[in-house]
Amino acid sequence: TGTIIREDYTVEANKHVITGVADDTNTAKVALVGVENKPGVAATVFKALAAKNVDVDMIVQSIRSVGEPKTDLIFTVAMDDVVLAREVLEELQKTVDIEAVNIDERMAKVSIIGAGMLGQPGVAAQMFDILSQEGINIEIISTSEISISCLVAEDRVKDAVRVIHNGLLLDQRG
């Protein structure tokens, strides 16, 4: 029982899965360091941001180690929302145990776009390898059915777009 959302397809039928590379330099990384690791904390954080119309993207929650009572919550916001996000989060620190609010405004998102990314094993690995070979560090990774996005240092985003284009788009057409 259930609903089929898409038909099955073969790798051969979708060989040219990547249709473009995009970048977004209007991005800041927000890191909430040492957040209480208990139910409801993430909801509290994101409800507070939503109440002020701060749009959030690329969310990552990482447990420091097994049994650790703290976690780090990292996400991105648009540059226009940085000041407001900082105000909201600093106010939230009064009621939620958050050790630090760190914001890095020197970030950018680079994405590969194409239909059926989830049906193509290895595409993300290829992207990560290409960035690695160029010495570009990935801060955050986000995936969806149609895209794979990486947060990188803003001063490396043009290099990232170039090497991904050359390594993935040109390779699949050749």
Q: Regions from the language model: what does each represent?
A:
Residues 1-174:
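C-terminal catalytic "cap/lid" subdomain
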